[in-house]
């Protein structure tokens, strides 16, 4: 949102997509004095960050669909992350967002806004300050599992998930 000058024009169209059943995932944005409207509901991005790559990540909403499918997310999924956990976490948000994960550097206060999810119309909007741009290229398995859940939210589980039952053609 802070890299495109026309986000004020694009954002309403993006929210219509979400409202109609789409999923939008916004990855971290720098904190700016005049923040554009990012999501369907108010949120304020801070300069909060978690730089210790081994910092504990706590699951705040263990029953949320984002944590339970298609992959069951556990503490194991946060092992092996590289460089940092994340940055530019929101520090204020509308009650219609659900905070999913929390983390903090040693001696710091919890940063509960690292992954926020809101239902909007028929779809889902997510804001994440976690460093997917580092974890996915590094091949961190847990990052792939979590991001898969993010892009799958609201989708029906496939009827046949056993890939071994698919016949191979010669």
Predicted regions: what is each one?
Residues 2-3, 74-76, 87, 100-106:
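Intrinsically disordered, low-complexity segments enriched in polar/charged residues with Gly/Pro
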Residues 11-12, 85-86, 112-113:
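A generic local structural motif
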Residues 84-94:
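Active-site Gly/Thr loop motif
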């Amino acid at each position: 949102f802070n890299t495109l000058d026309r986000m004020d024009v694009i954002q309403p169209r993006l929210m219509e997509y979400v409202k109609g059943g789409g999923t939008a995932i916004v990855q971290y944005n720098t904190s700016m004095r005049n923040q554009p409207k990012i999501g369907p509901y108010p949120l304020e991005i801070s300069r909060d960050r978690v730089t210790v790559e081994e910092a504990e990540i706590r699951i705040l909403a263990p029953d949320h669909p984002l944590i339970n499918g298609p992959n069951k997310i556990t503490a194991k999924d946060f092992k092996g992350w590289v460089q940092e956990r994340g940055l530019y976490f929101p520090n204020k948000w509308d009650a219609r967002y659900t905070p999913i994960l929390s983390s903090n550097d040693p001696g710091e206060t919890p940063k509960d806004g690292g992954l926020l999810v809101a239902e909007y119309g028929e779809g889902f909007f997510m804001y994440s300050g976690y460093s997917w741009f580092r974890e996915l290229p590094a091949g961190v398995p847990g990052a792939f599992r979590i991001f898969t859940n993010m892009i799958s939210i609201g989708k029906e589980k496939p009827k046949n998930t056993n890939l071994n039952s698919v016949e191979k053609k010669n």
